[in-house]
């Protein structure tokens, strides 16, 4: 290589395109120029530019000198775009140095000429995708591939041009504004963005404008805020507006790019419209028999507003003479309709037509729009009442009548009146509902409605009568109405007064004069209007009583006192004092009652000790409750007794059935040779089912045996005691609990042994059956009367031994003795 003159350094050439040259001729921004100059001026601290102290301050060592490269985006030429040139000051131009680059886009986007160091852009660049590329440059010896200069980093910046139009990124836009809003009311804000470099030129400076809808809305050029342009937006006229907003870059200058968006603006409702009835008069009809609560009809006022601004209420103003309470109106919350309802009975005859004024008004009124007028409207509603065939009407519908209880049958009680309310005014017929007058105490004239007595009356039995009177049309009995009548029976003095109770009093023998014995009161079933007043005196037949006196206390009671000192009950122990009671009438009635006074023996303190032979019983009475309680107790006792008897009978029948079922298991052992007093005793079933402790049977055990006779066993001689030679069978029964199952083997063994003994006994007659028995308890002194062991003739028998058996066998002995005498007489 040729020696390089000192003071030379790395140079980098930049090929400027016409557009870039134009930009450089313009005054560049101070920051960019400073950056370029700083990059183009070697610095002691920059890579590849260091200062050598041996050569002095003005001597610089060989190295890289390079500028920042620029390339314009969106190049449309057919040839590669020249970017710039890198060069080492050691390059002599002989091709010994090879230039290479590495980094972003090296070899693809950017290519370098190895000999000259020229860099070209091979692709179309877009600054909006990538604003700069960072690469590294190397200078190598072509022969040895040795680095001649340290590797240096440089940047290729993509120069922006206005190639991106503004874009609205947040659409679609929907805004709203209330109707009748003032001019300049903010609706919403729209914003666009531009991908161009905002720091270079005016490519990203945007301005906003209205392309469509400028008559109603405006937009701020800088902020994009949309506002109303007029104060009279009316939702009822137009509810939705489509406004086109445009954004232009280059600050709106000629040649700038633009983008647009459509903004939907909805006009919201306010309550600026009053309700309006579609017509000024409505007509309805309803039958006069319609019950209260029946809907007459529906009316709806229209409101151009929406939502809650259409909520309304209705009121009725009645202009008819019937007043304002015949109908009422309610509002259907779902349909906002007025429902006219009947709230009083209708009557075609009294008023066939009703005219009311229906008023509708908004429920919510906005005071901002009060100057627009009253938010209410009115309409006339006419309701025609149609006639129906109605039943007669009682006037009055109920009443009270009075009659004396001594009124004769057929006496007039009162008159009821009913009339047909219809225009035809048909005749009315009357009757009494017999369900309310089962005893037919009253009758009524079918034509006049006059009520008379049908039977005799008694106030004391029934003081009031409630009857139902029927009225019906003469030619249509289905049209029927009812009226309730209360008939009060007026009292007359027809019952004499009576003593309140059968009075009995007791007085001591040593009573003093003037001693109070009894206070008398009276009852009277009558109820005079002025109240009761009773008078007491002794009967005229005995006006003066030497023993007792009667004092009228003037309060409907009287007192009985003693007249003298002491009584002798031995002479007279009971006094009967007749008392006359008279009422005040009219007419005055009286009755006589008797006060029974008993003379009794008393102690020193006046306590009664005895009242002769007749017991003194104080008058007492039981209340209905006490009587009922007493009857209930008696019934309970009767039921308990019947229940006990039923249970006992059921228990007996149960035992009887059990005995019948077990009859086949009974073994009855008896002795019929005596007087018979022990024959009815049988063993208990539980004992028979238990195991007998028979022990070892001996040859002489088992008693006598006989075949087919009434009793078995050997008979003794005529004069010997009965069965003296027979050993008795006595077996003890086990005392433990009975065996759950009967052991029949014991009985088989016992019977088998008895049969074997009978077979071996030559004295036993040849019968197929035999009986065996044993004794239990005390022996009977009576011997056997069986003829099994007797002689061949009755004459050979001697019954003299019967007389030795005791007094119980004397009739039997006399019987056999007489029989013997007859036999002897026949024999002689």
From Swiss-Prot:
Signal peptide: 1-34
Residue ranges of every copy of the Cadherin domain listed in the record: 64-168, 169-277, 278-394, 395-498, 499-616
Region Disordered, annotated ranges: 702-745
Molecular function per GO: beta-catenin binding; cadherin binding; calcium ion binding
Cell location: Cell membrane
Keywords: Calcium, Cell adhesion, Cell membrane, Glycoprotein, Membrane, Metal-binding, Repeat, Signal, Transmembrane, Transmembrane helix
Primary role: Cadherins are calcium-dependent cell adhesion proteins. They preferentially interact with themselves in a homophilic manner in connecting cells; cadherins may thus contribute to the sorting of heterogeneous cell types. PB-cadherins may have a role in the morphological organization of pituitary gland and brain tissues.
Record-given protein name: Cadherin-22
